[in-house]
Curated annotation (Swiss-Prot):
It comes from Rhodococcus hoagii (strain 103S) (Rhodococcus equi). Coenzyme F420-(gamma-Glu)n binds at D40, T77, T108, G109, N113, G178, G179, V181, V182. Belongs to the F420-dependent glucose-6-phosphate dehydrogenase family. It is an enzyme of class 1 (oxidoreductase). This is F420-dependent glucose-6-phosphate dehydrogenase.
Length: 337
C-alpha cells in the first residue's frame, strides 16, 4: 500500500522545442497523469539537436491549456542567473493563475547554465552553492507572506520589497538532493523532496530517505506530509531494440557528477557523452519491453518511501510512450496504492 501515490511526466526541455514541449504537457493530462515537471536550463546538454525553452513561459502555457495537473520545475537554481526575489514574484503570479497547482523545485546548480550567463570567477564549491540555496529559499518565503521585506543576507538583499499578488500560503518548495546533507534540509524545510533514479537502491534506502526523515524529525514535522518525488528514467517500449536505442540521446546523464556540474559548454558535454558505449548509457535507465518486469523494477522506489513517481522517457516519440504507459504501466502502478 502506497499512501498518496502520484504519477507524473518529466517534460524534457533539453530534447524538445517550446511548442512540442507544451503539447507534451497537455498530453500528460489527457493520459491521466497527476503532474508534469520541467527542467530549467539556459543551455542543453547536447549542442546538436538540443533545446532549452524557458521553464516559466512553458509552465504558464501548459497551465492555460490544462485543468488539474500539478506544474513545477525539476529543477530551477534560484541563486546565480536569477534573483530569488524575481523567482518568488514569477511563481507567486503563477500560483494566483493556477491555484493549488504550482510548485517550485530547486537545486544547487550546474556550471553549464550559470557561467554562460555571466558568472565570474571559479565555479563555487558545494558549500557555497548550498548556502546560497538555503538563503534564497528563506528570502522567497519571506516575500510570499505579502509583507514588506528588508532582507540582508550573505548573498541576497531586499529593501522594502513586497510581492502584491501572492496565493494564500505561498508556493510549495521542493528541494532536490543527491546526498544526505541536502536531503536533511529537504526534510527540515521542503514541502517536497526530489531525487533521481538509477544510482543503486542503497542510496535511497540507506542515505536519502533516512536523511529526509531525520530532517523532518528535527524540525518536528511529519515525514508523511512531505511529497517524496523521484524522477524515474524509464525507456519502455514493446520493441526491445527501440527501448535500448532510445536512451542514446540522454548519454550526458551517464557522465560523472563532477563532469555534469563543471563542464560549461554543450559542445564539450556532447563530445564526452557520445564517447560512452550504449551499454553504459542504458545503465541509468529502466530499459524494458515487458510491463510486469518494468513495474517490478519501479516498485523498490515505492518500497523505499517515495510516493510521487515522475517518469522521464528518453525517446523522441513521447506520444507513443504515453500511450504505452497509460495502457501497460499506469494501471499496474496505481493498483499498488
Amino acid at each position: 500500500m502506497v499512501q498518496g501515490l502520484k504519477l507524473g511526466l518529466k517534460a524534457s526541455a533539453e530534447q524538445f522545442g517550446p511548442r512540442d514541449l507544451v503539447e507534451l504537457g497537455v498530453m500528460a493530462e489527457e493520459h491521466g497523469l497527476d503532474s508534469v515537471t520541467v527542467s530549467d536550463h539556459f543551455q542543453p546538454w547536447r549542442h546538436n539537436g538540443g533545446h532549452a525553452p524557458f521553464s516559466i513561459a512553458w509552465m504558464t502555457a501548459v497551465g492555460e491549456r490544462t485543468q488539474r495537473l500539478q506544474l513545477g520545475t525539476s529543477v530551477m537554481t534560484p541563486t546565480f542567473r536569477y534573483n530569488p526575489a524575481v523567482v518568488a514574484q514569477a511563481f507567486a503570479t503563477m500560483g494566483c493563475l493556477y491555484p493549488g497547482r504550482v510548485m517550485l523545485g530547486v537545486g544547487t546548480g550546474e556550471a553549464l547554465n550559470e557561467i554562460a550567463t555571466g558568472f565570474k570567477g571559479e565555479w563555487p564549491e558545494f558549500k557555497e552553492r548550498f548556502a546560497r540555496l538555503r538563503e534564497s529559499v528563506q528570502l522567497m518565503r519571506d516575500l510570499w507572506t505579502g509583507d514588506r521585506v528588508d532582507f540582508e543576507g550573505e548573498y541576497y538583499s531586499t529593501k522594502g520589497a513586497s510581492i502584491y499578488d501572492v496565493p494564500e500560503g505561498g508556493i510549495p518548495v521542493y528541494i532536490a538532493a543527491g546526498g544526505p546533507v541536502v536531503a536533511r534540509y529537504a526534510g527540515r524545510a521542503g514541502e517536497g523532496f526530489i531525487c533521481t533514479s538509477g544510482k543503486g537502491m542503497d542510496l535511497y534506502t540507506e542515505k536519502l530517505i533516512p536523511a529526509v526523515k531525520e530532517g523532518a524529525e528535527k524540525a518536528a514535522r511529519n515525514f508523511a506530509d512531505i511529497d517524496r518525488m523521484i524522477e524515474i528514467k524509464i525507456s519502455y517500449d514493446t520493441d526491445p531494440a527501440a527501448a535500448l536505442e532510445n536512451t542514446r540521446f540522454w548519454a550526458p546523464l551517464s557522465l560523472t557528477a563532477e563532469q555534469k556540474h563543471s563542464i560549461d559548454d554543450p559542445i564539450e558535454m556532447e563530445a564526452a557523452a557520445d564517447a560512452l558505449p550504449i551499454e553504459q548509457v542504458a545503465k541509468r535507465w529502466i530499459v524494458s519491453s515487458d510491463p510486469d518486469e518494468a513495474v517490478e523494477m519501479i516498485k523498490p522506489y515505492l518500497d523505499a518511501g517515495l510516493n510521487h513517481l515522475v517518469f522521464h522517457a528518453p525517446g523522441h516519440d513521447q506520444k507513443r510512450f504515453l500511450d504505452l504507459f497509460e495502457r501497460d504501466l499506469a494501471p499496474r502502478l496505481r493498483a499498488l496504492a
